[in-house]
Amino acid sequence: MLGHLAVWAACFFAAAGPSLAQTATAVAVGSQYDSTHVYVSPADLDRFVTSFIATFGGTASQEIALTVTPTPSRTYWRFITSPVGTLSVFGFTTPVPYPFGSERTGYLVSDMDAALAAATAAGAEVIVTPFADPVGRDAIVQWPGGVRMQLYWHTVAPHFPPLTTIPENRIYVSPQSADAFVRAFLAFSQGRVTADDANAAGIEIGTPSATFRRIRIESAFGKMTVLVTDGHLPFPYGREIMGYEVSDLTATLAKARAAGATILTSPYTSGGRRAAMVEFPGSYIAEIHDGGA
């Protein structure tokens, strides 16, 4: 399925790598294999890819028309490898079958059955049961708080170089579900909480007069920032699904603007980093930050 197409990209960018370790509990492969899922209109697909690469660097596959869901559908697809993360970009020419489009990322796992067993044991629901595609198997799971992710497995292991910086999944959850989500994801990912700030500055979510709880997690799947809010969020906060780390925010924002992106918020400093919100062609919104925790 969606993120599973990363192995197709391996045909463009790399030869097959070593076999993947398989254990009952440790199923992550590496953050360079975790693809952000970006849904745009077919007319915006190439514009988005060009803009993203001009901003961050990287390479993209050629456009392919294919079916990536277990029910009939058709999409154009391109895969981006960049120093700050990998992306699967879809421009559907048919209606998108439910629940596709609501999953935020695809995580490559070493063993699909073990991964689903670990996810359900940790408290996730399997909302799309495994189905075959030409290169492996795919499924979608839902965590406490309604957070949806794809898991995918390759018949032949791909091999991508490590990322320069690891992107952050930005997860917005309610106070009622935050602890349940964190417990479940930590049990599944075997990750750790690197910071839990009960009074993070509200400027990070567009509410400078307030505070909120911010939890940072790291695991073999990559980084994650959990933003625990009351849902009183001004646009565009809550619409972004990923944060990208760069060495020079000012220079990166200049590149983004020149490549057709819109800078939605002025850079702010909080939590040891400078950050801004950016909208790329096709309405893909991302947080971009430098330095910090």
Residues of each region from the PLM?
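Short, structured interface segments
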Residues: 139-160
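C-terminal functional regions that serve as terminal interaction/effector modules
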Residues: 241-249, 255-256, 262-269, 276-293
